[in-house]
Amino acid sequence: MVCVPCILLPVLLALYIKFIQPIVFRFLPESWRTTFDALLYPTCPIQIPTASAEDATTVAAGKSVKVDGENVQKELDNYDNCTDSSKKNK
C-alpha cells in the first residue's frame, strides 16, 4: 500500500504548478518573477555564438553556418510563448 502523502503531495504540486502558479505570477513584480524562475527552474543560459554579417545572411536563409568547427543552425528568436516578458522587449 502507498501512504496518503505519497499520492496527495504530487497531485497537489501538479495542480499548483499547472493552475495556481501562473495566476500568482501575474500579480508579482517582474524582478520577483525572474528571481523565482531562477530558483525554481535552474538552467544554464544559452550562449549563441556571434557570426559576421555575411554569415548572418546565410543563417537567415536557413542554411547551416560553420562556427568553431561545428555546424550550427540558428533560428530567428521567437519569444511569443516565453513566460519571461523581459525577453520579449529585446
From Swiss-Prot:
This is UPF0729 protein Bm1_03610. Belongs to the UPF0729 family.
